[in-house]
């Protein structure tokens, strides 16, 4: 899995969060779509949510899942203005955790037990 974030701010916590989750087994296409994933590009399920950011540019959080293998391809925080990874501060991290928690509640993701 690729993780896209600028290496400052809360980047380490964001990476730890990404590494602590995985897809639940046997998720149907319908479940992905009900949880907010799209597949306009047929081989990929794509989850994207805008984040409220103090910068004047829009920032998004996204997860890409390969439809055939049901594996997470990438997770990232993207500056939509420049289409580049963005840094994660406390506010963004809280919003990302909220989105991840909702996907856990939907049964799409689960936390890896250590």
Where are these regions (language model features)?
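N-terminal low-hydrophobic presequence detector
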Residues: 1, 31-32
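Intrinsically disordered, low-complexity regulatory regions enriched in serine/threonine/proline
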Residues: 2-9, 13-20, 25-27, 51-53, ...
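Ser/Thr-rich, low-complexity intrinsically disordered terminal regions
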Residues: 26, 33-69
């Amino acid at each position: 899995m690729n993780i896209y974030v600028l290496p400052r701010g809360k980047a380490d916590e964001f990476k730890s969060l990404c590494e602590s989750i995985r897809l639940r087994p046997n998720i149907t296409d319908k479940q992905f779509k009900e949880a907010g994933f799209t597949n306009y590009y047929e081989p990929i399920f794509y989850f994207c949510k805008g984040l409220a950011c103090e910068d004047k540019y829009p920032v998004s959080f996204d997860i890409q899942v390969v439809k055939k293998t049901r594996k997470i391809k990438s997770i990232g925080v993207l500056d939509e203005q420049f289409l580049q990874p963005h840094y994660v501060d406390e506010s963004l991290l809280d919003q990302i955790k909220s989105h991840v928690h909702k996907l856990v509640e939907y049964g799409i993701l689960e936390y890896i037990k250590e």
